[in-house]
Amino acid sequence: MEMTSAFTLNVRLDNIAVITIDVPGEKMNTLKAEFASQVRAIIKQLRENKELRGVVFVSAKPDNFIAGADINMIGNCKTAQEAEALARQGQQLMAEIHALPIQVIAAIHGACLGGGLELALACHGRVCTDDPKTVLGLPEVQLGLLPGSGGTQRLPRLIGVSTALEMILTGKQLRAKQALKLGLVDDVVPHSILLEAAVELAKKERPSSRPLPVRERILAGPLGRALLFKMVGKKTEHKTQGNYPATERILEVVETGLAQGTSSGYDAEARAFGELAMTPQSQALRSIFFASTDVKKDPGSDAPPAPLNSVGILGGGLMGGGIAYVTACKAGIPVRIKDINPQGINHALKYSWDQLEGKVRRRHLKASERDKQLALISGTTDYRGFAHRDLIIEAVFENLELKQQMVAEVEQNCAAHTIFASNTSSLPIGDIAAHATRPEQVIGLHFFSPVEKMPLVEIIPHAGTSAQTIATTVKLAKKQGKTPIVVRDKAGFYVNRILAPYINEAIRMLTQGERVEHIDAALVKFGFPVGPIQLLDEVGIDTGTKIIPVLEAAYGERFSAPANVVSSILNDDRKGRKNGRGFYLYGQKGRKSKKQVDPAIYPLIGTQGQGRISAPQVAERCVMLMLNEAVRCVDEQVIRSVRDGDIGAVFGIGFPPFLGGPFRYIDSLGAGEVVAIMQRLATQYGSRFTPCERLVEMGARGESFWKTTATDLQ
């Protein structure tokens, strides 16, 4: 059976050829290797028709142009040579589009990313819509790759090398007005006239290339270029800690093209693409992509979700304000906040105002749209307006009696169908639901701070939670833009449970003489975004350590924190960044101020901070405890799969993405090697390092958590 073409050609009466992109059976247009023959057949027709005045590429999808290349193509490559050949095929196809003798225009609406932008760059002009859905970027670096179809060569010549490097090295996505300002697109128009605007541009004479800004022209010269690449290389190395080989190859390939010409640049690009595709870092990053995509498709349970027309929030503090923002402004669901104090309501409203006003200032949002979104949020000091709310999110203090009281009040003041979701980070959901008249509608919905930035939520049903309650809560989390994992109702749930021994070990090393900055730097070098001591300061030392006694009571001595250290720090009024002093000292300007280690911390905990062990040893001690606890969570079915475990660790605590998550990292080392390391550490430092039974058994049998493919489990 012949495959329906993803590219169709229609010649208008004005002799403009319109090529419509519509991948059959898919919501998103993605480029596949088999499309090359389709495009070449169309190019042949275009060349044969001497009456044509121009060509326009446009998408038939409602909200995307081309979202990128199909990543499965890379996974199907067994060697670097196969992946390189894939890149060369893409380069050749883009070159054939660019070589057409008539004006070729890309009419862009929605996501234009990766291979989609490379196709647009191969065109002679680009018009995009002013819709918020329209974004342009080259995100391949986030998969451990570089643009392989000419993007590293065309983009610097179009918008300048420094701007192009920023886009390619970070995967940054541009909105329409930003793209216009940088010269990436030639015009920005309403969606309703996109095709006609592109057609008019296609009819015009091909313009000479737009002159680059003076700064970019200086940086394109040999001296400026040498200085730029040295500075960018140094900055990139500091940011990546050498853990992401793609960034180094991007710099190398872009510089080759500028110094030696496009032919050498394309050759270097294809070679680098092939080699990067085979790196363990790219394989791990692609596994995270597939896993997160899979999680987003998971409904959480087999039951159909209930309607979600309105949400209530109890508590207008930092978490309540953040939850209100993502519910109203991301999910588009009306929110009513209840707080006993009018100041709490004002705080929550101001939180959303600050977020939206920032978008208006950056021209990412119109003032009218800001006002429309803010109108979805209202407040009250009692339960007026709560009677028909479909779901209530409780974000009050971590106190069991208070949360049980909230359940009782919601059941008294809200409808019989209303779901009660607690944002607890440590209290058992079963205990919160203990006195509920409708316990099947009580569930945990654990957000991470700051709510608007952290992508993960944990959804925690207790033994009596209904399947529909689970499905409805998962549905809400997805609408809020979150990646939800369903976890079992056990102490610490998943993320805090694997994080606690990691932080405990860092504090223990601190008491044994290691310096704060040495510990943090060691884990940043390993690949975490911040070190464990700094993380504790950011979360709040009082907040971050509150869960330790809960975990110790549930799981025993391996969760005990170093005696008296935490109490000594808290008794000295050290809460972390929020009160300006923790392990670090912070200036008076709040969150943007520069921090420095407070030397007074060492005598406070009874050490001189002289340090004795290497950075890799520091990282090993912290990370091995995290891995061991993650395996226990699988064994106890705290998480439903190692997929959820990897996603939870990467999205919830910043476990190094280039390692793929705790379980993929164990597989890369080998379970037997992890067991050997832990047994050595147990001999040196104590029984808390004893490897769990599941890990020992897997090591003995040579088993892995994941199969060889990026998406399947054993």
Curated annotation (Swiss-Prot):
Subunit: Heterotetramer of two alpha chains (FadJ) and two beta chains (FadI).
InterPro entries the UniProt entry points to: 3-OHacyl-CoA_DH_CS, 3-OHacyl-CoA_DH_NAD-bd, 3HC_DH_C, 6-PGluconate_DH-like_C_sf, ClpP/crotonase-like_dom_sf, Enoyl-CoA_hydra/iso, FA_oxidation_alpha_subunit, FadJ
The protein, known as: Fatty acid oxidation complex subunit alpha
Region (Enoyl-CoA hydratase): 1-190
Family label: In the N-terminal section; belongs to the enoyl-CoA hydratase/isomerase family.
GO cellular component: cytoplasm; fatty acid beta-oxidation multienzyme complex
Signals that turn on the gene: Unlike the aerobic pathway, the anaerobic pathway is not strongly repressed by FadR regulatory protein.
Gene name of this polypeptide: fadJ
Organism: Escherichia coli (strain K12)
